[in-house]
């Protein structure tokens, strides 16, 4: 039988501690145990949570549960005995909600500053396992109207077409756009293809009257700003 948290004094159970003390007082193990809900045969949910965090730390030192974002489905389920697809889905949903919530407060920040753009995008993009091209739509005050993913997969000029990049910008009456894509390798150094795509999009933006303010290449813990590097030419 699965060891039960009911054997613990009620005051020591994670859910009860959260309700009484607030989530900030709980350890990562306790918060993860609440998400998992139950343990596995012969192991309590606390033990499963502790093992999962240990394995994630081994794969990505200092990264914690973020390691799960880089793994394939089969690899996630093999990390810890008793971690089935349903529990993996619950954890991933919690992680992505946290990433989106951490990005939301920056929506009214002046995103002409490349560092602010990176801090806005990093929770969404820095840990993606595949390459994505995003367009940030801005109003006249450089506040975010929306963010749209226009391409997924290795970037090529055929995938990132000006028509797709500016279609929503025109429809939403955007004043300007900021381009961004991630490098799953973690290295934000722009490739020759990145430079060519940027050049074409800057030219297209000038023709239709929607300025491309910057293009950021997002890596893990760092970024390259085309504007800062003097590469925003067309």
UniProtKB/Swiss-Prot annotation:
Instruction: Quote the InterPro entries the UniProt record gives.
Output: MPN (IPR037518), RadC_JAB (IPR025657), UPF0758 (IPR001405), UPF0758_CS (IPR020891), UPF0758_N (IPR046778)
Residues of the MPN domain: 110-232
Q: Where is the short sequence motif JAMM motif located?
A: 181-194
Q: Offer an example of a GO molecular function term for this protein.
A: metallopeptidase activity
Listed PROSITE patterns: MPN, UPF0758
User: So where does Zn(2+) get bound?
Assistant: 181, 183, 194
GO biological process per UniProt: proteolysis
Q: Which UniProt keywords apply?
A: Hydrolase, Metal-binding, Metalloprotease, Protease, Zinc
Q: Which NCBIfam families match?
A: PRK00024.1, radc
Entry's family note:
Belongs to the UPF0758 family.
What's the protein name? UPF0758 protein STH371
Q: Which organism is it from?
A: Symbiobacterium thermophilum (strain DSM 24528 / JCM 14929 / IAM 14863 / T)
């Amino acid at each position: 039988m699965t060891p039960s948290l009911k054997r613990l004094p009620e005051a020591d159970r994670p859910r009860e501690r959260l309700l009484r003390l607030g989530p900030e007082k709980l350890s990562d193990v306790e918060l993860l145990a609440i998400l998992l809900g139950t343990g596995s045969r012969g192991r309590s949910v606390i033990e499963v949570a502790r093992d999962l965090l240990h394995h994630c730390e081994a794969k990505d030192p200092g990264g914690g549960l973020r390691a799960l974002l880089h793994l394939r489905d089969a690899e996630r389920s093999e990390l810890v005995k008793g971690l089935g697809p349903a529990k993996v889905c619950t954890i991933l949903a919690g992680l992505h909600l946290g990433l989106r919530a951490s990005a939301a407060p920056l929506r009214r920040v002046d995103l002409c500053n490349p560092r602010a753009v990176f801090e806005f995008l990093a929770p969404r993009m820095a840990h993606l396992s595949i390459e994505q091209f995003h367009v940030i739509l801005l109003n006249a005050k450089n506040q975010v109207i929306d963010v749209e993913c226009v391409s997924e997969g290795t970037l090529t000029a055929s995938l990132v077409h000006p028509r797709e990049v500016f279609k929503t910008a025109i429809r939403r009456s955007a004043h300007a756009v900021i381009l961004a894509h991630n490098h799953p390798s973690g290295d934000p150094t722009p490739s020759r293809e990145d430079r060519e795509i940027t050049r074409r999009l800057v030219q297209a933006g000038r023709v239709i009257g929607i300025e491309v303010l910057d293009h950021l290449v997002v890596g893990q813990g760092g970024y390259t700003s085309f504007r800062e590097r003097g590469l925003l030419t067309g």
